[in-house]
Amino acid sequence: MKERVTITLDKNLISQIDKRIDGIDIKNRSQEIELLLAESLGTNIPSKAVLLVGGRGTRLKPLTDRIPKALLEVQGKTITEHLFDLLKKYGIRDIILCVGYLREKIKEYFGDGSRFGVNITYAEEDEPLGTAGSLKLAKKHLKGSFIVSNGDELKNVNIPRMFRLHKRKDALATIALTTVDDPSHYGVARLDGSRIVEFVEKPIKAPSNLINAGFYILEPEVIDMISDGFSMLEKDIFPKLAKMGRLRGFPFAGQWFDIGNIERYKIAEKKWEGIIPIEEDEVDLE
């Protein structure tokens, strides 16, 4: 909900504000002033995050026969707790866990989150719904900008910087992007500046080596685009947003590990450094 206000500013301030208006990403004074106020008041990060932890982890068998991959440990701490660490680093403590496979074990382990310094709400799927379908279950809890993260990856992303890009570019969705030598196993983005002009899931011929790092900032309108039943953000939603010109990419240089199979899981166990700031290495495409 927005309210109209009237303010009086010094001419020099107005001149500085007008210089930031490009008619494309920043369309008027009101939008630029709102962004500047949000940044100065510290409301420069989403307040809620959704972690998608309902998958069966079939490529991690036999480890996931009795243990959900959300509870697999890397260096003595569950994968999910490492994600909590990233979110808590930036003051994000309201977390929704989208659960499915072996959900009772996840709920028993994490409870309401107080033991881990977070507040947990659960969105439960009775059958596999995909990354978009499970997100839709959390709709009633998501009124403003929010974060979504896959639950089977470790990542170190500068969330405030990513959110600033997201808001300044008036995006409906912003995807954190990392690079790999072989992008054919992932969602791949082609950028024009920060705008994702093409997004292809697991392409035979990749348009770049920038891949989806499984970490997003979304607006509630994205949930309204999700159809009932099984649906994937990567295949059903992101390509549409790219065509609309409302999908942005945030390349980052922090650590990222996909823990989707046994081999990658072992690599993460050896090389993950924890949530360490690498801000000076991150790319800021404003």
Regions found by a protein language model. Give the residues of each.
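Conserved N-terminal catalytic core of the sugar/cofactor nucleotidyltransferase
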Residues: 2-4, 11-26, 31, 35-51, ...
